[in-house]
Regions:
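Active-site-proximal alpha-helix that buttresses catalytic centers in soluble enzyme cores
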Residues: 38-115, 229-230
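Glycine-centric low-complexity repeats
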Residues: 1-37
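Generic beta-sheet signal
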Residues: 40, 195-201
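Active-site metal-coordination segments of metallo-dependent hydrolases
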Residues: 59-68, 94, 152-162, 166, ...
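Acidic, low-complexity terminal tails and accessory targeting/binding regions
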Residues: 36, 121-131, 190-195, 211-339
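Phosphate-handling substructures
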Residues: 108-174
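Active-site metal-binding loops of divalent metal-dependent hydrolases
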Residues: 46, 203-204
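Sec-exported extracytoplasmic/periplasmic mature domains
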Residues: 78-85, 102-109, 177-184, 211-214, ...
Length: 339
């Protein structure tokens, strides 16, 4: 998905940002835990014929790169290689991501690992239809809702394998967990001093997956600044402590504003019952009473924990904001998104 675009940047300052993006700044990664922090550079594939024609193109294995896409792949490989070495290289089942990953893999003598969780969000019956169309709008509705804290919303594309945001996010976070584990198994330190891996994926999966999981989401960027071909979205953190958005196509992302932090608190509160309800629903089809009982029990525990944590999280964020330098920067808004 997404039109043709030029190579994006891979630089950015570590920090938290959100609905309001300020200048980048150092910030603590995640909200707790002693897990080792890593950096993941999510890189969108190069141009495909579908991109050039502005078509919805998500099916596996899909087409390869255009001549321009091959040039973009080599250009981003050269840029990334200069910032290496890397702990790992990953791509999806889509030919276009594999062809985009190949130049970097060849330069560094590494073998990319294929992760289905990096596949593009599946468009079902809307495959090969124009992006600018009713089908294109319907394709967007579900994933946008997922980033706003409603993963239970179904994908409004009949036939999609990503039936809702819960299914999509579990596949995506599973891929991220694999990247994390593999990175720690080969803890090569990049030029900037961080353990870093590169994951080649697709525009919507990168955007929606990161916005659903980072502690500084900015969902509007999905619409105002779609990731271009070979553009990069950089995150830092770990599965235990959480993930922070570092940069979006070269735009540094600064610390979270108070509204963003409170949004994340609400997101954590309202997603817990959605996941619990979906797990209970799935357990009903197993025909196993024990599975249903376990799903109900686990769901109750998760919802209870979210309810207990919510007021503490809100209080912490308000207290932090009282003396936080970015509190005075709340008026920073949409005009500053794109320099």
């Amino acid at each position: 998905l997404g039109g043709a675009g030029g190579a994006g940047g891979v630089d950015g300052a570590i920090g938290r940002g959100g609905w309001f993006i300020g200048t980048g700044g150092m910030a603590t990664i995640g909200g707790g835990g002693n897990g080792q922090s890593i950096v993941i550079d999510f890189v969108r594939h190069g141009q495909t014929p579908g991109n050039a024609a502005m078509l919805i193109d998500t099916a596996v294995p899909g087409p390869g790169l255009t001549a321009l896409g091959q040039q973009q792949a080599q250009a981003i490989a050269n840029a990334l290689a200069a910032k290496g070495p890397y702990a790992g290289i990953f791509d999806s089942q889509l030919i276009r991501t594999q062809q985009t990953a190949a130049p970097l893999a060849n330069l560094l003598g590494m073998a990319p690992q294929v992760l289905p969780g990096l596949n593009e969000i599946h468009a079902g019956i809307f495959e090969d239809l124009p992006q600018i169309s009713p089908a294109g709008l319907l394709y967007l509705v579900g994933p946008i809702a997922w980033t706003l804290g409603f993963p239970i919303v179904p994908m409004l594309a009949p036939g999609s394998t990503d039936v809702n945001g819960i299914v999509f996010n579990r596949a995506f976070t599973g891929a991220v967990q694999t990247i994390y584990d593999a990175s720690l198994a080969n803890p090569v330190v990049a030029a900037d001093g961080n353990i870093t891996s590169v994951a080649y994926s697709s525009a919507f999966t990168i955007g929606v997956g990161t916005m659903m999981n980072v502690d500084n989401p900015h969902p509007l960027l999905l619409l105002t600044h779609p990731v271009p071909n070979t553009g990069a979205v950089v995150v830092q953190g770990n599965p235990e402590g959480g993930w922070t958005l570092v940069s979006w196509d070269g735009i540094p992302v600064g610390p979270a504003s108070l509204p963003t932090a409170l949004f994340v608190d609400v997101r954590e509160l309202i997603t817990a019952p959605q996941y619990a309800a979906y797990d209970i629903w799935e357990s009903l089809f197993t025909g196993d009473p024990a599975a249903v009982i376990n799903a109900v029990r686990d769901g109750a525990d998760e919802v209870g924990a979210a309810v207990v944590q919510f007021p503490h999280a809100v209080a912490d964020d308000v207290i932090d904001a009282t003396g936080h330098p970015y509190l005075s920067g709340l008026p920073i808004g949409l005009p500053s998104l794109i320099p």
